[in-house]
């Protein structure tokens, strides 16, 4: 039997434990901001686009998202597939997004080395680069955006926001994923058309409404 002197402390702990439940079950658990993926134009850096033909349920099935698009941008024979997704389940976006976005399509490829780079034209952007395996040319670049910041280290993001995510409204993360099937061998990331396309998409998305 619990001693009476511990009752106040137990009550406090129970009350604290109930806060996340009350917030996410009875309150407005999702924060609605002003950003939408449809703010990204169908023409970027001279590349015109058409829908990729992905199933309408793709975003919901893989990312629990209704705010997403996937387009094939082409210019003078070059083609880059751009996928943008917003989700209140951040892990679905930052944990190997290529598994859902790139595999199982004609752009599909086995990626090798992963690194994060910063280009001089946009040093604030941590661009995640997925290099092709030996003999392949497909390359993918992606950027993650959450609550006004770009995410460079998803593990640190998860650690830093663990408590906040429990006691506050959920906020959406946004993935910008550019997939180039014919990148040159050992390219300079800054000079890739996919990099320019990715930057233009992000600038359009974040432009003041």
Task: Label each residue range with its predicted role.
Residues 4-21, 25, 113-209:
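A short, solvent-exposed beta-edge/loop patch
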């Amino acid at each position: 039997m619990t001693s009476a002197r511990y009752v106040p402390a137990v009550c406090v702990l129970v009350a604290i434990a109930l806060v996340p439940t009350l917030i996410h079950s009875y309150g407005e658990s999702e924060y609605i901001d002003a950003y939408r993926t449809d703010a990204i134009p169908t023409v970027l850096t001279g590349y015109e686009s058409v829908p990729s033909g992905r199933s309408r349920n793709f975003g919901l099935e893989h990312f629990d998202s209704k705010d997403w698009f996937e387009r094939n941008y082409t210019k003078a024979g070059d083609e880059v597939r751009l996928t943008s997704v917003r989700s209140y389940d951040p892990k679905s976006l930052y944990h190997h997004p290529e598994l859902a976005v790139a595999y199982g399509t004609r752009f599909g490829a086995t990626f090798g080395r992963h690194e994060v780079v910063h280009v001089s034209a946009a040093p604030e952007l941590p661009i995640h680069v997925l290099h092709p395996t030996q003999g392949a040319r497909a390359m993918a670049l992606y950027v993650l955006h959450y609550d006004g910041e770009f995410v460079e280290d998803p593990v640190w993001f998860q650690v830093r926001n663990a408590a906040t995510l429990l006691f506050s409204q959920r906020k959406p993360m946004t993935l910008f994923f550019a997939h180039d099937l014919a990148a040159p061998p050992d390219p300079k990331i800054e000079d890739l058309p996919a990099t320019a396309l990715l930057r233009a998409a992000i600038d359009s998305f974040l432009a003041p409404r």
